[in-house]
Amino acid sequence: MASVGLQLLATVLAIIGWLGEIVICALPMWKVTAFIGNNIVTAQIFWEGLWMNCVQQSTGQMQCKVYDSMLALPQDLQAARALVVISIIVTFMGVFLTIAGGKCTNCIEDQDAKAKVVVAAGVFFLVGGILCLIPVCWSANSVIKDFYNPTLSDAQKRELGASLFIGWCASGLLLLGGALLCCQCPKNEGRAYSVKYSAPRSAPGAYV
């Protein structure tokens, strides 16, 4: 098994990525208005998230409203809801397995079993990172495509919100942490091999 420091590094990276997933799930900052308008006094900034949208006035006051229906969301945000929630759950399971199989814990006595549990945790982190990366990239692609769509007015166009950048960082940390843990796959060096022993044949005249 690899060193305790490598395991701790991978675990810390994954936990930070997991917290980033929770942040992007909660914050309504996936999309933001691209154009404020000519009148700064009456300007409004619109934020769109997975669960609510918010309006920020020029005075700094912000009002948020939960979506009345899931069907009111665009396809990318509908998929992002499910994928981000699943990613948070999968990553949490990976954190639990990492703690259970860590070299500095005594939850599992067998060292080979510990190594397998840690590798399984790495797989969970990789899956969680991919599940988080898909909706973030999908939403970013949708924002960029609509931004350059000539049929949409300036008020309908959006820019990339802070949640998308946080999501990219969180996915990268999860993928890195998962890769570090998967590199700790146990080797088969200690496996015992059975050696067949054949007794030497005695010569015909040995007992004469």
Swiss-Prot record:
Stated family: Belongs to the claudin family.
Task performed by this protein: Component of tight junction (TJ) strands.
Protein name in UniProt: Claudin-like protein ZF-A89
Keywords: Cell junction, Cell membrane, Membrane, Tight junction, Transmembrane, Transmembrane helix
Gene3D superfamilies the UniProt entry points to: 1.20.140.150
Keyword Membrane applies: yes
Molecular-function GO term, any one: structural molecule activity
Keyword Glycoprotein: no
Any single Gene Ontology cellular-component annotation: plasma membrane
Membrane topology: Multi-pass membrane protein
Spans traversing the lipid bilayer: 8-28, 82-102, 117-137, 160-180
Example of a GO biological process term: bicellular tight junction assembly
Gene: cldnd
Cellular location(s): Cell membrane; Cell junction, Tight junction
InterPro entries registered for this protein in UniProt: Claudin, Claudin_CS, PMP22/EMP/MP20/Claudin
PANTHER family: CLAUDIN
Short name of any one Pfam family annotated for the protein: PMP22_Claudin
